[in-house]
Amino acid sequence: MTSIESHPEQYWAAAGRPGPVPLALGPVHPGGPTLIDLLMALFGLSTNADLGGANADIEGDDTDRRAHAADAARKFSANEANAAEQMQGVGAQGMAQMASGIGGALSGALGGVMGPLTQLPQQAMQAGQGAMQPLMSAMQQAQGADGLAAVDGARLLDSIGGEPGLGSGAGGGDVGGGGAGGTTPTGYLGPPPVPTSSPPTTPAGAPTKSATMPPPGGASPASAHMGAAGMPMVPPGAMGARGEGSGQEKPVEKRVTAPAVPNGQPVKGRLTVPPSAPTTKPTDGKPVVRRRILLPEHKDFGRIAPDEKTDAGE
């Protein structure tokens, strides 16, 4: 980094120095009768002719230098004082910013530490509520089931005790006792199991449906299974002979044939392996070598002197 150095004292000293000495007139030849004397006199006069302008330029330059030196001395001093004031202000501002930054950092650190601590009670309450919900639901279900069982038992006993033909005679008592012994209506048991002799034909994905025969006497199925409005259903054992007759009836079996699967028949047959291609094997494991012998011609190739003599003698 380049630093600027200033010396106001030297600038003031330069501004207070005396001005330059003006140029003096040069000697002029007095002249003479000859041409040389005349030329020398003209040269001296022409040399001294521009001394006035040169002296004026020198004096103007000196005045300009003095003014610049004094201006530099004043401006550098004022600039130094202004820079010192600015540095003091920057230092104070920097200290304030540093203090605010330190305070912000400390508050952020404390917030990061205290944040989880303030959330601990809320998290504990949420965990307690989550743990209590299964217990509360189980208690509510238990209380609701006990209350419903007590109400249903009371209604069932009231309905059985209010029937006119159930309390007279031993037979009625036996029938009533059998009915109150916990028999379950056949309508709640669902369809009967399929016999093992005939495999079921109903697909696994199809819903099971029970087909029941209408009760004898033209009564609707709803009237046979449904009691009075708002009263529980009476077991078949408490209904006398009709209850026994309805209990012996069996529902009619219903067979459902599933649609055939396309291309689902098993494939029968045999696979024939094609014969392998014949291969050529070398004899005794060695390759067969073929040789070609070329015979030379009689007159063109391989003729020697005795052969020519023999041909000439022939």
From Swiss-Prot:
Keywords from the named record: Cell membrane, Membrane, Transmembrane, Transmembrane helix
Domain of life of the native organism: Bacteria
KW Membrane (keyword) present: yes
Segments traversing the membrane: 23-43, 98-118, 221-241
Biased composition (Low complexity): 203-212, 219-232
Main location (coarse class): membrane
Localization per Swiss-Prot or TrEMBL: Cell membrane
Comp. bias (Basic and acidic residues): 294-314
One GO CC term on file: plasma membrane
Disulfide bond annotation, renumbered to this chain: none
Keyword Cell membrane listed: yes
Biased composition (Pro residues): 190-202
Region (Disordered), start-end ranges: 165-314
Topology versus the membrane: Multi-pass membrane protein
UniProt-recorded name of the protein: Uncharacterized protein MT2145
Source organism of this protein record: Mycobacterium tuberculosis (strain CDC 1551 / Oshkosh)
